[in-house]
């Protein structure tokens, strides 16, 4: 797979501001600039080219707003590496990203609950969302407290993000609770029961997961996992607000899917 050619703004300015310069990190910044869109790897099991899709996630985790090709980004990554036992050279490599991915993934209650191979039972109680909360007025369901948290988060996002306030479809849910029987039928129909797209034990069976609209690239659907579409999503103000603020409402993201968020206020 070659470099992505998105129809969105570039992910970083050509030059970093003075605040993103850091003495001693030039070589690391240059290495990050070279690897951003070129190397082939598969951090989530599917071949990808480079790590540009995950820039916003990495920036959030290492606590910097500096662009990925800057010395400031490299310095912040180096500090994160030091704290997390990953050396400290400031270079995004596959081992470093996988370590960061592990930190993010283990915040998901569902990941911890399924680590032993067990799959959570379906909830005893789910509640219907309002039709306007479903994408295209689709009827969706979640656990009651998860739905309440979703509503509080969406209200805060729309108050803070003009993009989300202006588009009534932004942050609507296109998939909430899904029964195991429905998931099994879908994965059999798609011929992909064990891959990324369909999983035998899906977080959606818990009633805690919500796939939310965070934008989509021209020509793609809101749930397309095409690299160009995922890259577009990570540039939206709505997605970046969620990265910074969803945790306040108990939601965590599955990094491969910018649209997939899980509420952690109850056990799966």
Region annotations inferred by a language model:
Residues 193-268:
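Catalytic cores and adjacent binding grooves of peptidoglycan-active enzymes
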Residues 149, 182-186, 208, 238:
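Amphipathic alpha-helical interface surfaces
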Residues 92, 96, 104, 175-177, ...:
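A mature extracytoplasmic/lumenal domain signature
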Residues 1-165, 180, 247:
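Cell-envelope/ECM-targeting effectors and their regulatory/trafficking segments
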Residues 65-73, 167-172, 228-239:
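Glycine-rich, flexible loop segments associated with nucleotide phosphate handling
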Residues 89, 111-112, 185-189, 223-225:
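Short, solvent-exposed loop/turn and secondary-structure capping segments
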Residues 77-80, 171-177, 186, 210, ...:
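Long, contiguous hydrophobic alpha-helical segments, chiefly transmembrane helices and signal peptides
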Residues 158-191:
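Extended, low-complexity, intrinsically disordered C-terminal regulatory tails
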């Amino acid at each position: 797979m070659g470099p992505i050619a998105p129809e969105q703004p570039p992910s970083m300015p050509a030059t970093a501001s003075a605040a993103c310069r850091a003495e001693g990190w030039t070589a690391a910044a240059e290495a990050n600039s070279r690897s951003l869109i070129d190397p082939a790897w598969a951090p989530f099991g599917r071949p990808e080219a480079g790590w540009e899709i995950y820039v916003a996630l990495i920036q959030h985790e290492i606590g910097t707003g500096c662009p990925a090709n800057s010395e400031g980004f490299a310095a912040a990554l180096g500090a994160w590496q030091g704290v997390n036992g990953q050396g400290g050279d400031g270079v995004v490599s596959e081992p470093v990203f996988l370590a960061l991915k592990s930190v993010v993934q283990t915040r998901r209650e569902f990941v911890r609950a399924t680590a032993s191979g067990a799959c959570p039972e379906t909830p005893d109680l789910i509640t219907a969302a309002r039709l306007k909360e479903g994408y295209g007025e689709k009827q969706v369901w979640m656990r009651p407290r998860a739905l309440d948290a979703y509503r509080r988060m969406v209200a805060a996002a729309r108050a803070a993000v003009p993009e989300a306030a202006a588009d009534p479809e932004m942050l609507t849910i296109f998939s909430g609770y899904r029964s195991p029987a429905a998931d099994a039928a879908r994965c059999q129909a798609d011929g992909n029961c064990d891959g990324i797209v369909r999983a035998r034990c899906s977080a959606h069976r818990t009633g805690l997961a919500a796939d939310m609209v965070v934008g989509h690239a021209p020509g793609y659907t809101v749930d397309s996992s095409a690299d160009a579409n995922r890259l577009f999503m990570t540039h939206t103000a709505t997605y970046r607000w969620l990265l910074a603020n969803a945790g306040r409402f108990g939601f965590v993201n599955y990094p491969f899917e910018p649209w997939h968020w899980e509420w952690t206020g109850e056990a799966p």
